[in-house]
């Protein structure tokens, strides 16, 4: 048995056996490289197979302030030696200064038979962080300082909680004793008196000293003066600029420890200039925001950016340029390379949410600054944890949308092209349903899709408004918007009025298009009308005789064209006039690519549909419904300015996608979105013979049987005919409707069924560690975020020794 160093007492003593020698060397290197404990005297003590314990060894143990026991299999064997165990029991007492590190040995109640105070030892494991090892040693040394025994506030055998389960202590002060240090910043070359206030009573009969330990120069001890039982004053020595460790000694015991800083005049000027050049304060002063308020500035900048963005938004150009490969090469040698980094640093939450909807947002998100930090880590570094969470969830939601589309549409040879197109078509869904639910232009342009009866007048007014209003960013005037809302709300009620007016003609089969009376006046020439919209079916009794003075609207539209081309290869115009009324068979799709999220209505669309149903049922009239909708829009606009409101909407969208994925996994189906039949005004239409617009006779198939189409069935196993595959896709697209099963996914009153945890996609590691130490590179460093280099270099810990029997 031997101890390295002179056995006259030490601060840290490491006890080990030969099988834990590598761990002993690692801890020595760790403690010597740590600024917090490297000034302490460190010795090691080896217990070999034939070890003996002398009185000199026992004296060394008793004079040590912290004993680190590397509990390995060979060391445990010494506990079974009757001659050695009593000496070890005395050496490992009192328990508050003993720290055990389990090296290949599990904790067991058997050790209580050897050491009654076993439960009071601090316990560490091989998986703990290096900072935990240092903090545990600091805790043992601090408790051995004697302050607790002076005040007698705690019993000596008080249980010490395992430090591996506690949070790391801050690097500024030692726990318990220090209260205040004034001043904590000292100008180089100036004579300054430092006052230290502690919690424990000091004995003025014992010599009190202060030790100043710069990082790059030897330590300096100065005699301190005890002003009273709790206050010490000391003259600060003249040191170079930088951080200096300050320790207060009462005799040979360390009372407290803290860190102060020395600065030069030029460094102070630099600090003043950096504070004066704070961009947030500068902008608050420029915009006359007094007192300085970051939230007010955030709203002002957000509104300014919104006013300079087109009304329909920039999301049309897409935002999914997330760099997924070789992200470390996408690093800039700047502190704030993009506006997104700037908004994240200063906590401009609303501006950040708006920037995420702009083109290139995710590309900017994947750019690291000169320190290797990304916008989300920058936000957390400066204390904006809610903003960090919002950015992470937004990026995850975009990735979820892309993955969901990819799973649904990537089938066959055209998978790549379809996926790229769908990725761009569905990016605006994220903004409409989560970040900007009250987008007027998207709302008005989509009204016609829900009320085919009012599409003609709506199309005409929209065209007139767009041609007569050249102001950019204002596609429709307020009068036009009010008129469109009124016509939308009157859609079903007008249809009911026409039915009541024509009750005398029961049994009459009307055309699917509007019929125009001869005495009605039209302000727009029929030849200049836009294309005929989807017809509106009416519920009338079949077999009725049609009035001779009513002429189908379709004939007026194609009147001039039929004169220029008198005959048609399939059927003549006379047969169309004299034949029975027909319902067109839609062979052409409405869009070239199917969007699985097309049926997901925005909050504004749902509100309009709700008011329309109330008007139809007579609960409110049209004027009241218009006022209710305007009030809802105003309230929605005020709420949308709230960052919390945007967080809630984003969470609803995420929960909707997550719920669909979970339902898909439970059911085992290939897809979770079903294509339904378009909504009709009457849900109970009788089965009728179908006619084509250009066909003289009925089709053989009356109404095709309703089958549930799944995207797994879009392409069958038969690939011999290209036409069959094309027809299959065409027939699928022809069943597009405004209700594809996603209407209730983003309701305001929706209760999320799934709480999704944060995925590890975005970089989650902040570049600023809580301590100045870094974990030894036992695990390869993460590629997404690199820690800045520090002055301390640690070696990886050795492997864990094999477990004993």
From Swiss-Prot:
> What InterPro entries does this protein's entry cite?
B-cell_PI3K-Signaling_Adptrs, DBB_domain, PIK3AP1_TIR, TIR_dom, Toll_tir_struct_dom_sf
Q: Which GO terms describe its molecular function?
A: identical protein binding; phosphatidylinositol 3-kinase regulatory subunit binding; signaling receptor binding
Q: Which cellular component terms (GO) are annotated to the entry?
A: cytosol; membrane; plasma membrane
Q: In terms of one coarse class, where is the protein primarily found?
A: cytoplasm
Sites of Phosphoserine modification: 642, 718
Q: Where is the protein found, in the record's own terms? A: Cytoplasm; Cell membrane
Question: Quick one: a GO biological-process term for this protein?
Answer: toll-like receptor 4 signaling pathway
Q: Which organism is this entry from?
A: Homo sapiens (Human)
Q: How does it sit in the membrane?
A: Peripheral membrane protein
Residues covered by region (Disordered): 145-165, 527-547, 571-590, 654-679, 697-805
Residues in DBB domain copies = 181-317
Keyword terms of this UniProt record: Cell membrane, Coiled coil, Cytoplasm, Membrane, Phosphoprotein
- Summarize the protein's role: Signaling adapter that contributes to B-cell development by linking B-cell receptor (BCR) signaling to the phosphoinositide 3-kinase (PI3K)-Akt signaling pathway. Has a complementary role to the BCR coreceptor CD19, coupling BCR and PI3K activation by providing a docking site for the PI3K subunit PIK3R1. Alternatively, links Toll-like receptor (TLR) signaling to PI3K activation, a process preventing excessive inflammatory cytokine production. Also involved in the activation of PI3K in natural killer cells. May be involved in the survival of mature B-cells via activation of REL.
The protein's name is: Phosphoinositide 3-kinase adapter protein 1
Task: Please describe the post-translational modifications of this protein.
Answer: Constitutively phosphorylated. Phosphorylated on tyrosine residues in C-terminal region by ABL1. Phosphorylated on tyrosine residues within the YXXM motifs by BTK and SYK. Isoform 1 and isoform 2 are phosphorylated on tyrosine residues, most likely within the YXXM motifs, via CD19 activation. Toll-like receptor activation induces appearance of a phosphorylated form associated with membranes.
Quaternary assembly: Homooligomer. Interacts (phosphorylated on tyrosine residues within YXXM motifs) with PIK3R1 (via SH2 domain); required for BCR- and TLR-mediated activation of phosphoinositide 3-kinase. Interacts (via polyproline C-terminal region) with ABI1 (via SH3 domain); the interaction promotes phosphorylation of PIK3AP1 by ABL1. May interact with MYD88 and TIRAP.
Origin: domain of life: Eukaryota
Domain-level remarks: The DBB domain is required for dimerization.
Q: Does the keyword Metal-binding apply?
A: no
Region described as Necessary and sufficient to mediate inhibition of NF-kappa-B downstream of activated TLRs: spans on this chain = 10-144
Q: List the disulfide bonds.
A: none
What segments bear the compositional bias annotation Basic and acidic residues?
654-672, 707-716
What positions belong to coiled-coil segments?
645-667
Residue span(s) of domain TIR? 8-145
Q: Which SMART domains match?
A: DBB (SM01282)
Gene that this polypeptide is encoded by: PIK3AP1
Compositional bias, Low complexity, is annotated for 717-740
Tissue specificity annotation: Expressed in natural killer (NK) cells.
